[in-house]
Amino acid sequence: LSPPPPPLAAEIRRLGEAAVAAGWRLACLRPAVGGERLELAEAGPAPAYDPAAVAPARDPAAGELGLAVDLGTTGLAWRLLSLADGRTVAEGRGVNPQLGAGGEVVSRLAFALTPGGGELLRRLVLDVLVRLAALAGRKPSALCLAGNSAMMAIVCDKPLAGLAHAPYGLSWRGGETVALGRGLPPAYVPPLLGPFVGADVSAGLTALVAQNPAYPFLLADLGTNAEMVLALAPGRYLAASAPLGPALEGVGLTDGAMAGPGVAVDFELTPAGLAPVLFGGPEATGPPRGIAGPGYLRLAAILREQGVLDADGRFAQNPAPTPLGRRLQARVARQGGEAVFDAAGCRLFASDVEELLKVKAACNLAMAGLLGAAGLATSALAAVYLAGAFGANVSAEALETLGFFPPGLAGRSHVAGNLSLAGAALFLTEPARRATAEALPGQTAIVPLVAPQAGVAGGGDPFISRMVFSYVP
């Protein structure tokens, strides 16, 4: 192995002195120069398709098959389904193979704009699509790809300049069938509503509208970006997007992990204290191997409720107001000069809390911007639909406690599942639904979050002012 370089302060703080002395370093802080011989740590738990679930895809009784794909910045979800009756014959999820090129859209686009970078990223996704298509044992007859505007432009080999830097705009708007090559069927890409409101939103909104929801409602898909649509009436929509980074996907936090076996997706208070709830339900046992984004939010909400965290995100210096809070407070220590909470064997550092505050501020900004642009009171909302893998696991009460959403919305929040994937599947089994999606660009106004309605009374930075664990209108 190559000799380790001198440790950085951040590596000592995060890894501990023993690990640093043993030669471990953080790859995310070390630019590769070539020629190094390295030992890689065991990869954290990442979701992948269950081979047992794939077997039915080879059932000839399913008839012609379609492949629906939701390509996110961090994750990739897919479904093979019968075009005859719409039934699912296989499905799964995993990581976007481009993740090594950057955990959020900006760095991904920057890599794609380097010589050969875009072609490499495109090839990585096409390799996955080819493998998924092969699971059927025969070529799928149809393919639909949904995802944010950047992911769609990269995989479809479209111009990226208007997505990567100002002035932002769309040079390609989707809503058409694209030839991907590699023996894949032509892919239908739903329309892009804006440079930061993509085909995943148009697909998800179409799937939700097909269920005849009551208006007005809010559709929120929180992942690497916060993509929100405020539906005022049929055919009248406001949309906004805010970059969140990969923290809610479990990426970039000290003990973060994508939801999967052995990963804590929730926490609960028991007579014995704080207990993690692992992915997979009550039958999943053992110490957590990491914490997913929803688990981090629930943990922070509990600590906030018990007075262990202050509203500004700092670990409280004053004694917590309840005996339980003081018991939890006793688990706060210092490591590498930073406050850290021991969460059932996992750690919540002060710097992790800061990352959650940044995510909260961006989400709060999008919510306030939409409601302000519509002149709509929170009480007027009929429902909030939480979409995506994150929405399937997150506690609406935690979102309200931490100020992501205004008070009173938790009781009107509903888990909607992966609506982007549902919409992609709908476009395959009911092609007439594509017309509904293709009308959305003309029915949707994009709300810029730097507009005056996104600010706060008295001026100040609208993002910084929302870096508190309470909702700021």
Task: Specify the residue positions occupied by each region the protein language model found.
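Fe-S ferredoxin-like electron-transfer domains
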Residues: P5-V69, L76
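Short glycine-rich phosphate-binding loop at a beta-alpha junction
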Residues: K139-N148, A300, T378-G388
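Conserved phosphate-binding catalytic cores of ATP/NTP-utilizing and phosphoryl-transfer enzymes
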Residues: A48-E64, L184-F217, L371
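Acidic, glycine/GT-rich loop-and beta-edge segments that sit at the periphery of enzyme/chaperone cores
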Residues: W24, E39, A43-D50, Y188-S202, ...
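N-terminal phosphate-binding loop and adjacent alpha-helix
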Residues: P97-L135, P261-F267, E355-K358, A362-L365
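Glycine-rich phosphate-binding loop of actin/hexokinase-like ATP-binding domains
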Residues: W78, G86-E104, A161-T177, A203, ...
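Catalytic phosphate/nucleotide-handling subdomain of diverse soluble enzymes
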Residues: A368, G372, L376-P441
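A contiguous, well-structured pocket-lining segment that forms one wall/lid of small-molecule binding clefts
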Residues: R304-A374
